């Protein structure tokens, strides 16, 4: 209950003053706490902090609830249970405390904020039983509204008798006096607000949502509106995971009060001709519809990051210095960080500690680790920003631990967002413009990339995204901004995030005979924006399979014993925070080495078997620079050294060079035919007609020869590509030179044998080469669809000579086939 004054009808100028003795006692005890509580050095703890409040921009004193409990247990209990009731009195005690020591403006208000509450509640635990209690909740900010002035205490002028009515408290909506305080005047409605003499405070609404860790399985995240006032405004941005300390309150639901349906309900009772209402009393059906529209809102007095020291928004803070980070740590923690920086095997130990449950895939672990350290963002003299964040894409067969990497990073990084490409749209990934229910203004609601600002955005099933949605993140991946022009809102928002994506190959399994670009459903612009591509192939290897199976069984049977970490996750977070404040410069020696390695990549691009997965561009040069800077940061170096560039080049080389391609099986069609023949009517079944009994004892003479499996004819992939390119080039040359462009299959075989005449030394070799070229042509026609057979089947007058056409058809190149560079 707040201090209130009310005028009794006919009581003249006498006012009945209602006193809240409990609140006044709390005010006195809280003033004693501010004046008497001392820190370990014997100084009054809050004296200096209170004296700073005389500055114009300051008005809030943050008090530790632990100190309050130590000073007076009964006072802390009363404040916790009756917070909304006693809060104005606590603010008055603070104003008295400051006023006794410094001169302050009379109109200035002061506010108290509490932190370090012992218990933290989830959003779904907030019920009506917690209204008015001091509570601490946590959640992730998903929407922020602009800051507005809020009327907290109004001064009104009576338009009938000109009486000035001061200090009319506003109850979360515009509240006029019930009646004029002049006993002669009976005005109840005609009042004018005097804005010059009223008191306003900064006011901001934010919407928070349950974090993924708090969410029960299968539940939809709940959200809650939080009201911030005074110094608390602009202290939380979209994507922050914060603790809010305050109380749960009930406010009128303005959006429900102003809905068209409610308005129509009240306007339907119109007066008739005789002044009577056309409708009678309709019972309880509409009783109180407009009066019972209330909702729960959290009024916060203090906002703090969920893990303020080595979590929350400070993990990726670029403005930290080594000294400020050292001051946040204990002596023991700082010694551990220093010990880690001197570790000779730091690179390997960090990888094994970060992903202890994933066997193998060491290159992927190294790439993801360097992504967490990141490069150095730069701004050119013209104002162009060069990103420092590293983007990584993992492509691989099913069950190769792609999603596990994403989940590990999401759990480790305090500002990481996990999403699925198939279930996400462009607005959900970038940002959406939505209309506010109360003010009807358009506000921006953060998407996954904005929520992961200064963090990591993990996108699973990246290849399943629609092309329109992939285009939406082009700008975010390179410029690290999101531009929005919708519904009159034009804004450029920050999305300084690293993207860790996982994608599946097109056919479900990675085809080694094709390049990376042909294996995944991603456009060239998206692929060029990734710094690293890692390809995981599920191979049948007895040693590897045994090691993986042993690791999985160990995890299921002895979870604690099987996880072997050199460093704990908290130690890695502390080391990451310390290492990221380094901004290494590239030395002249490293600069020359980077240029040399880039030239090697460019020369290798498109040269024979080592042809790269996609075009090497300047973006790959920038990727090498970022990876080199991340290596230097990891070793806490102020300068990029050639050994850092060498490791960056090695990692980049892993993703750029084509995965080792197997030999091409030219007897694939015969193997397939054999499988068909071995069906129910083949070896295991019974043939329709018995085989003729010939040879010894009724068995075939060639049975012993046929029983031995014949080795399939295989050709090296590079040789297969060379022969196919020769055939395509020859046929296209014939198309350009002659009118009759098509060649018969036999003519094409004879042409090829003449071309390689110098390589043939014997009749047996000639037969072998002829067999190979015939198999290659068959595969190009029926499997790769590079060549097309022209027949006369079905044409009029085509009966004559049709058999020869079937046996020896004309061949032309598929017009849709593009010869690879």
Swiss-Prot record:
Residues 346-553 form the MCM domain. Its main location: nucleus. O-glycosylated (O-GlcNAcylated), in a cell cycle-dependent manner. Gene3D superfamilies: 1.20.58.870, 2.20.28.10, mini-chromosome maintenance (MCM) complex, chain A, domain 1, Nucleic acid-binding proteins, P-loop containing nucleotide triphosphate hydrolases. The modification N6-acetyllysine is found at residue 643. One of its GO terms (molecular function) is single-stranded DNA binding. It is an enzyme of class 3 (hydrolase). Pfam families: MCM, MCM6_C, MCM_lid, MCM_N, MCM_OB. ATP binds at residues 359, 399-403, 504. Early fractionation of eukaryotic MCM proteins yielded a variety of dimeric, trimeric and tetrameric complexes with unclear biological significance. Specifically a MCM467 subcomplex is shown to have in vitro helicase activity which is inhibited by the MCM2 subunit. The MCM2-7 hexamer is the proposed physiological active complex. Belongs to the MCM family. This is DNA replication licensing factor MCM6. It comes from Bos taurus (Bovine). The lineage of its organism: Eukaryota, Metazoa, Chordata, Craniata, Vertebrata. The gene is MCM6.
């Amino acid at each position: 209950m707040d201090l209130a004054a009310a005028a009794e009808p006919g009581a003249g100028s006498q006012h009945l003053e209602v006193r809240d003795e409990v609140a006044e006692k709390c005010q006195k005890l809280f003033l004693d706490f501010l004046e008497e509580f001392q820190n370990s050095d014997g100084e009054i703890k809050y004296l200096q902090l209170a004296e700073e409040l005389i500055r114009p921009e300051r008005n809030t004193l943050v008090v530790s609830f632990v100190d309050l409990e130590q000073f007076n247990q009964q006072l802390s209990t009363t404040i916790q249970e009756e917070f909304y009731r006693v809060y104005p009195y606590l603010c008055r005690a603070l104003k008295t405390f400051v006023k006794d020591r410094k001169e302050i403006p009379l109109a200035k208000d002061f506010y108290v904020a509490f932190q370090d509450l012992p218990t933290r509640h989830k959003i779904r635990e907030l019920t009506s039983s917690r209204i008015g209690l001091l509570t601490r909740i946590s959640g992730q900010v998903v929407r922020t509204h602009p800051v507005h002035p809020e009327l907290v205490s109004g001064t009104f002028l009576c338009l009938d008798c000109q009486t000035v009515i001061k200090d009319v408290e506003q109850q979360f909506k515009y509240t006029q006096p019930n009646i004029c305080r002049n006993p002669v005047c009976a005005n109840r409605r005609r009042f004018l607000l005097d804005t010059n003499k009223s008191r306003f405070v900064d006011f901001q609404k934010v919407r928070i949502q349950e974090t993924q860790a708090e969410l029960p399985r299968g539940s939809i995240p709940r959200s809650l509106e939080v009201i911030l006032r005074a110094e608390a405004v602009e202290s939380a941005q979209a994507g922050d995971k914060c603790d809010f300390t305050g109380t749960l309150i009930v406010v009128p639901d303005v959006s429900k009060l102003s809905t068209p349906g409610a308005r129509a309900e009240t306007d339907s009772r119109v007066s008739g001709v005789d002044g009577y209402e056309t409708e009678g009393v309709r019972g309880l059906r509409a009783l109180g519809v407009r009066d019972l529209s209330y909702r729960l809102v959290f009024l916060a007095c203090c906002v703090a990051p969920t893990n303020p020291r080595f979590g929350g928004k400070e993990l990726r803070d670029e403005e930290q210095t080594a000294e400020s980070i050292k001051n946040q740590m204990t002596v023991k923690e700082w010694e551990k960080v220093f010990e880690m920086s001197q570790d000779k095997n730091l690179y390997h130990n960090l990888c094994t500690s970060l992903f202890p449950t994933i066997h193998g895939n060491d290159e992927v672990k190294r790439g993801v680790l360097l992504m967490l350290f990141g490069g150095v963002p730069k701004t050119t003299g013209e104002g162009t920003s060069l990103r420092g964040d590293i983007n990584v894409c993992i492509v691989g067969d099913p069950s190769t631990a792609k999603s596990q990497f994403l989940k590990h990073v999401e759990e480790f990084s305090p500002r990481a967002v996990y999403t699925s490409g198939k279930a996400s749209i462009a607005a959900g990934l970038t940002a959406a413009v939505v209309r506010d229910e109360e003010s009807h203004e358009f506000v921006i609601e953060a998407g996954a990339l904005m929520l992961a600002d200064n963090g990591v955005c993990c996108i699973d099933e990246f290849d399943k995204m629609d092309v329109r949605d992939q285009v939406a993140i082009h700008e975010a991946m390179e410029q690290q901004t999101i531009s929005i022009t919708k519904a009159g809102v034009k804004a450029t928002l920050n999305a300084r995030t690293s993207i860790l994506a996982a994608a599946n190959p097109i056919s479900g399994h990675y085809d080694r005979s094709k390049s990376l670009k042909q294996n995944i459903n991603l456009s060239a612009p998206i692929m060029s924006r990734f710094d690293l591509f890692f390809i995981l192939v599920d191979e049948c290897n007895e040693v590897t399979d045994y090691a993986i199976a042993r690791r999985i069984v160990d995890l299921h049977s002895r979870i604690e014993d099987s996880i072997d970490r050199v460093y704990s996750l908290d130690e890695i977070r502390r080391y990451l925070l310390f290492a990221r404040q380094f901004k290494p410069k590239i030395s002249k020696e490293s600069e020359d080495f980077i240029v040399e390695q880039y030239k090697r990549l460019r020369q290798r691009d498109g040269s024979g078997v080592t042809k790269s997965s996609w075009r090497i561009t300047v973006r790959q040069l920038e990727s090498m620079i970022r990876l080199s800077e991340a290596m230097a940061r990891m070793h806490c170096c102020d300068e990029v050294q050639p050994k850092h560039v060498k490791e960056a080049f090695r990692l980049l080389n892993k993703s750029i060079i084509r995965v080792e391609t197997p030999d091409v099986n030219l007897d694939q069609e015969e193997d397939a035919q054999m499988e068909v023949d071995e069906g129910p009517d083949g070896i295991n079944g019974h043939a329709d007609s018995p085989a003729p009994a010939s040879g010894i004892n009724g068995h075939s003479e060639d049975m012993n020869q046929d029983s031995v499996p014949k080795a399939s004819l295989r050709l090296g992939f590079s040789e297969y590509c060379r022969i196919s390119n020769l055939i395509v080039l020859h046929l296209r040359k014939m198309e350009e030179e002659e009118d009759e462009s098509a060649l018969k299959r036999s003519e094409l075989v004879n042409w090829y044998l003449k071309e390689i005449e110098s390589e043939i030394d014997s009749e047996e070799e000639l037969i072998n080469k002829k067999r190979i070229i015939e198999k290659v042509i068959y595969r190009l026609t029926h499997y790769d669809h590079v060549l097309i057979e022209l027949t006369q089947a079905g044409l009029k007058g085509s009966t004559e000579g049709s058999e020869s056409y079937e046996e020896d058809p004309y061949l032309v190149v598929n017009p849709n086939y593009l010869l690879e560079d």
